[in-house]
A protein has these predicted regions:
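Short, hydrophobic/aromatic beta-strand segments
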Residues: 69-76, 87-89, 131-135
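Bacterial N-terminal signal peptides that target proteins for export
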Residues: 1-9
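Asparagine-centered strand-capping/turn motif at beta-strand->loop junctions
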Residues: 62-69
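Terminal connector regions
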Residues: 26, 110-160
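Short, solvent-exposed loop/turn segments enriched in Ser/Thr/Gly
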Residues: 52-59, 117
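Sec/Tat signal peptide C-region and signal peptidase I cleavage site
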Residues: 20-26
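Intrinsically disordered, low-complexity Pro/Gly/Ser/Thr-rich segments with frequent PxxP/GP/PP motifs
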Residues: 80-118
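Bacterial N-terminal signal peptides
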Residues: 9-19
Length: 160
């Protein structure tokens, strides 16, 4: 019994005297007033030794995760593998209210982007806000096989 009490005392001591910051996953929230983001999009991937294309539907998701402030999407362009602009999705800013999401879909049959397609998305806010989640979701099925994966956007230019 005394041995168990010793172990319990040691365990409690470790828990009580360990700095709280070691328990926190992320004690710093990155706020920003805007960014230009690069988001990979795979309209197809290759499979097998003959590198057969496996066509995918691409969904671009933009999520304003700030609970109190809106953001404006000011640029949303789709590029193909060689970097040629395929489509400008907006011609004027689109406002996303707090916690609002927006999505655009590239159909599976649209192969124009190729395996190295990408989106460039730019957003702005009047105040520092939680950075939105901007990601692409790829999904496809062939026979009885299905595949799905995501790719997060990366900042390429920060706004001042």
């Amino acid at each position: 019994m005394t041995k168990s009490l010793k172990y319990l005392f040691i365990l409690l001591s470790i828990c009580l005297f360990t700095p709280f910051s070691l328990y926190a996953v992320d004690d710093k929230i990155d706020l920003s007033k805007g960014q230009r983001m690069y988001v990979p999009a795979y309209s197809h991937i290759y499979s097998g030794s003959k590198e057969r294309p496996f066509l995918l539907t691409v969904t671009l998701s933009i999520r304003n995760i700030d609970p109190t402030h809106l953001i404006k999407i000011t640029l949303f362009d789709y590029y193909e593998t060689q970097g040629k602009l395929l489509k400008k999705y907006i011609d004027k800013p689109v406002t996303l209210n707090p916690l609002e999401s927006l999505r655009y879909v590239i159909p599976e049959k649209d192969k124009s982007g190729g395996s190295g397609a990408n989106f460039i998305v730019e957003w702005h806010s009047d105040k520092p806000v939680n950075q939105p989640i901007i990601e692409s979701i790829m999904i496809g099925t062939k026979s009885s096989q299905g595949i799905s994966f995501t790719s997060r956007g990366r900042e390429i230019i920060a706004s001042e």
